[in-house]
Amino acid sequence: MDDQQQPTVEATGSSDDAGRGSGSSRRARVVGLVGAAAVAAAGAAVGATELIRSRTSTPAIPRGSILVNGVVHRVQSTADTPLLYVLRDELVLHGPKFGCGLGQCGACAVLVGDRETRSCVTAWTGLKDEVTTLEGLPARWAKEKSLTGGAAASTLHPVQQAWIDEQVPQCGYCQSGMMIMAVDLLTRNSSPSEAQIRDAFTNTPPSPHLCRCGTYMSIIAAVHRAARAMA
């Protein structure tokens, strides 16, 4: 099953990475995990400029469709299919990951409107707000800052850039959900304290965001960095 194989595919670091790795090689891998894939996927979907343009207004969502990353998609899956499978299997958006299938780990997190949502336990039907995945964060930021043209197509969301600068990921499997949670938090609180960051990641219903590599301190540093960049 593709979802079950993904941790192996993405956990490409050597044993040296257990000590946070060496500078340039580790940074290159982090950029690949966090940034390059997001920009490439967004561009491949509809073309970066068209994606930015589509986000200037919220399209109507016809019955049987969902609005994802600024684009309305007709869905073929049955009504009880979890949103995660629609995103990954139909729309080929692999930012959200299958972790537990119970909404308990956060690897599958996406934004519905401005709020973090566990897509593995959320049916795709009846969603009235836009869904944003990791791939859609650059366009979301471009819309917020009114960026156009080349600047819009090449600019990562500050949260993504902060994850790169702080070299947060180790295996990287959970980090899409972590970044989504960070965007949710910074939308509600533009300058969170360390205690507030910890609370957001550990007390978000239905359960905490889990990182089995233990990157929590780097995540806190990245959220602080992103907050400064977004100020």
Where are the regions that the model predicts?
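Signature of N-terminal electron-transfer/Fe-S-associated modules in redox systems
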Residues: 2-4, 10, 16-231
